[in-house]
Regions:
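N-terminal pre-domains immediately preceding structured catalytic cores
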Residues: 2-218
Length: 218
């Protein structure tokens, strides 16, 4: 996917004085649909243990994005959903090459539950062969949900989606966009709507949280 020439206005900063306060967000199955429960009950992949720093947390947030905005920090392998009151939900993500090739501001133009996956010609040549279309389900690389990012009416080809390889959360990988665990992408999906603003920081940005990781489980 070509790099889009869209500059990100890095207003504010993620630098905080002192420690970053983080609270481990409770995991709940209350937002799962009957189909989610059925498809996630026996996934065709090994259950992964996600390192605590990449588990879902509510954190302090010092930038100036408005509540309801998504911010993606590809370097740190985090995605933030901005809440009111200087807080955000922080999710750990896996970052593919396609994600590293995009930075800028976009909006969520389409949302899908258990989306089908249509491998591109480049993916077929590099990693295939795959079927021309892979039906939605736990074996599908797009996972339980997908957010399709647009700039105006143009599809950027950048996606935020679930995964059938949760063991890679917190890592850079060879292909794909922004991958989240299926439970996390379902949680994010339930917060956002079509038109939600998404800010993707460029690789090498210096806007990262400072200070030791602190928090408590709830």
């Amino acid at each position: 996917m070509p790099r889009l020439g869209v500059a990100v206005s890095l207003v504010g900063s993620l630098l905080l004085g002192g420690c970053m306060q983080a609270t481990l967000a409770p995991s709940s199955n209350a937002n799962l649909t009957p189909r989610d429960r059925q498809l996630l009950a026996h996934p065709p992949y090994a259950q992964a243990t996600i390192a605590e720093q990449y588990q879902r947390h509510v954190v302090d947030y010092a930038r100036r994005e408005q509540p309801g905005t998504i911010l993606v920090d590809t370097d740190a392998r985090y995605l933030y959903y901005v809440l009111p009151g200087g807080k955000a939900i922080r999710y750990g993500v896996a970052v593919g090459e396609e994600a590293m090739a995009f930075s800028g501001v976009a909006t969520v133009g389409r949302m899908a539950e258990w989306p089908d996956w249509i491998p591109t010609r480049e993916i077929q040549e590099r990693l295939g062969p795959y079927p021309s279309r892979v039906a939605g389900g736990p074996a599908n690389p797009l996972g339980a949900r997908a957010l399709y990012l647009y700039q105006g009416s143009k599809d950027t080809l950048f996606r935020i989606h679930g995964t059938n390889q949760p063991e890679y959360i917190g890592q850079a990988i060879s292909s794909g966009c922004i991958r989240m665990t299926n439970n996390d992408v379902i949680d994010l999906f339930d917060h956002v709507k079509t038109g939600t603003t998404v800010v993707v920081l460029p690789p090498g940005n210096q806007s990262t949280f400072a200070g030791p990781f602190t928090g408590r489980r709830i």
